[in-house]
């Protein structure tokens, strides 16, 4: 079985080692994938632990728990890039979730910082919302037109 993050490797070789040692991610994309898998597995503690300490994520435990307990469907990595320094990296992704039978897409360009040889999520930017046309392919990935699927 492929990993929850959509990688073709099995979970035991992809995100599980990072879930067992949150600071073992070698690049921001690994941490991003592990954070998504943690949402699928309802692992609130992992998500909190992998926020940058300056975010004080433990103070937002309820909001993070609510997000983690959403019905996440799949992750699509659009691009990755390193920042201005070797201690900064970005992952542009789309994460799909089901809310009451409707599929929604969260698109973000996440920023990660490396401190003491550990990667942390610090913040992200959301691209301007794009209006989906009725005849466009549905964002859920079904291959159907939006109007015949989630529209």
From Swiss-Prot:
Annotated family: Belongs to the UPF0225 family.
InterPro entries: NTF2-like_dom_sf, SEC_C_motif, UPF0225, YchJ-like_M
Name of protein: UPF0225 protein VC_1852
Ranges annotated as spanning the membrane: none
